Amino acid sequence: MIVNIASPLYGSVQGFRRLDFSLYATVAILISVGIVMVASSSLDFAAERYHDTWFFVRKQITFLAMGLVGGLVILAVPMSVWNKYSGLLLILAFFLLMAVLIPGIGKVVNGSRRWLSLGPFSMQASEIAKFCLIVYFASYLARRNEELRTQWSGFLKLTAVLLIIVLLLLLEPDFGSSVVISATLGCMMFVAGVPLARFLLLAVSGVAGLALMAVASPYRWERLVAFMDPWATQFDSGYQLVQSLIAFGRGGWFGVGLGNSLQKLFFLPEAHTDFIFAIFTEEFGFIGAIALIGVFGFFLYRLVILFRRASEQEQFFSSYVVFGIGVMLAMQAFINMGVASGFLPTKGLTLPFISYGGSSLLITCGLMALVFRVNLELNRENQEGKP
C-alpha cells in the first residue's frame, strides 16, 4: 500500500484551525503535566542510576517529538483508508504479540517478556496492538453491524479474536493489558448494539476467567493479598502500595509543592512510571489530584461529544474508533489511579499522557491523531453540506 502523504498532510496541518480547540488544549495540558511530573519524579533516580539528572526527561521529550511527527502522518491518512486496511492491522497485532514471545526477539523486563528490541529503542508489543485492535474492532463493528446484532456468528467471530489476543497477552504475561483490551472491546460491542444477553455473557465470562487466572497464579495472588492488607506485608509484597499511600498522606489537601516529594527519593519504586499519580498527589495534594481527574474527565467528555457527532452523521467506523479510544484511555487512567490509591490491585499500567514510557506516549499520540482526524473529517462534511 502506497499512500501519497504530502498533499493530505498539508491539508491536515491547514485544517488544524477546524479542530475542537478545547480537546486540543486539554491534550496539550495533559502532555505538559506529564513532562513536568516525569522531571519532578525522576531527577534524583536518574542522577543515581545513570549519572545524568535529565536522562528520563530527555528521553520522554524525544518520544514526544517522535509521537508528534508520527501523529502528523496518521492525521494525513483518511479514515476510509484505516477502515479498508484494518485487517492488515489485526495481522500486525497478532504478529507482534507472537514475536515478543520468541527468545532473542522479545526482551524480558521485570519477569515479563513484553518488549521488542528496535535498535536503541524498545517498544511494548501490547501498546502497538492496542492501536491496531481499536481500528480493527471499529471496522468490524461498522461492516458487520447487522450480523453482530442479529446472529451469533458475528458475535462469536469477534469473541474468538479477543480470546486469541488475551491468550497471547497472558503468555507474556500482561494481565493489565488483557483487562483493558477486553473491557474496551466489550464496551464497543455494547454501544454497537450487541444484544444485552450476549453482552452480559461476554462480561460475566470475561470477569470469571480473569478472576480465575488471578487466583491461580501465585504471583497475582500475592499481589491480591497485598492489596487487601498492604500493611501486613509492608516490607514485602505490600511495600510499593504502602509507600504510595504514604505519598497520598503526605500530600494532604494542598501538597508539599512541586519537586518537594520525599517518596520519590528511592522510597517508592516506579515513581516516574506506574506510580507517578502518587507523586503528583504528594506534591499537589488532594485538590491537585481532583483537578487532574477533572481534566481527564473533561477530555473524555469531549470524546463523547465527538462520538455522538460521528454517529449522528452516520460515520460509524469513526464513531467506534473515538469511542474505543475513549474507553481504553479511561480504563487505563482509572486503573492506574486506583492502583496508586489502594483502590485496585497492582496492574502495571501507565497513566496516559503522564507516566514516563516511550511506547505508551507514542501510541497515545497516534490515538489522538486518529481522534483529530475524525474531527477534521466531520467538520469538512459540515462545511461541504452548507448551502
UniProtKB/Swiss-Prot annotation:
Keywords: Cell cycle, Cell division, Cell inner membrane, Cell membrane, Cell shape, Cell wall biogenesis/degradation, Glycosyltransferase, Membrane, Peptidoglycan synthesis, Transferase, Transmembrane, Transmembrane helix
Pfam family for this entry, one: FTSW_RODA_SPOVE
The keyword Cell inner membrane is annotated on this UniProt entry: yes
Subcellular localization, as worded in the UniProt entry: Cell inner membrane
Associated pathway: Cell wall biogenesis; peptidoglycan biosynthesis
Catalytic activity reported: [GlcNAc-(1->4)-Mur2Ac(oyl-L-Ala-gamma-D-Glu-L-Lys-D-Ala-D-Ala)](n)-di-trans,octa-cis-undecaprenyl diphosphate + beta-D-GlcNAc-(1->4)-Mur2Ac(oyl-L-Ala-gamma-D-Glu-L-Lys-D-Ala-D-Ala)-di-trans,octa-cis-undecaprenyl diphosphate = [GlcNAc-(1->4)-Mur2Ac(oyl-L-Ala-gamma-D-Glu-L-Lys-D-Ala-D-Ala)](n+1)-di-trans,octa-cis-undecaprenyl diphosphate + di-trans,octa-cis-undecaprenyl diphosphate + H(+)
GO molecular function: lipid-linked peptidoglycan transporter activity; peptidoglycan glycosyltransferase activity
Enzyme class: transferase
UniProt GO BP: cell wall organization; FtsZ-dependent cytokinesis; peptidoglycan biosynthetic process; regulation of cell shape
Main location (coarse class): membrane
Entry keyword annotation includes Amino-acid biosynthesis: no
GO cellular component: cell division site; plasma membrane
UniProt-listed Enzyme Commission number(s): 2.4.99.28
Transmembrane segments: 19-39, 61-81, 86-106, 118-138, 161-181, 199-219, 286-306, 320-340, 352-372
Topology class, membrane: Multi-pass membrane protein
InterPro entries membership: FtsW (IPR013437), FtsW/RodA (IPR001182)
Function: Peptidoglycan polymerase that is essential for cell division.
Family that this chain belongs to: Belongs to the SEDS family. FtsW subfamily.
HAMAP family registered for this protein in UniProt: PGT_FtsW_proteobact
Descriptive protein name: Probable peptidoglycan glycosyltransferase FtsW
Annotated source species: Saccharophagus degradans (strain 2-40 / ATCC 43961 / DSM 17024)
Gene: ftsW
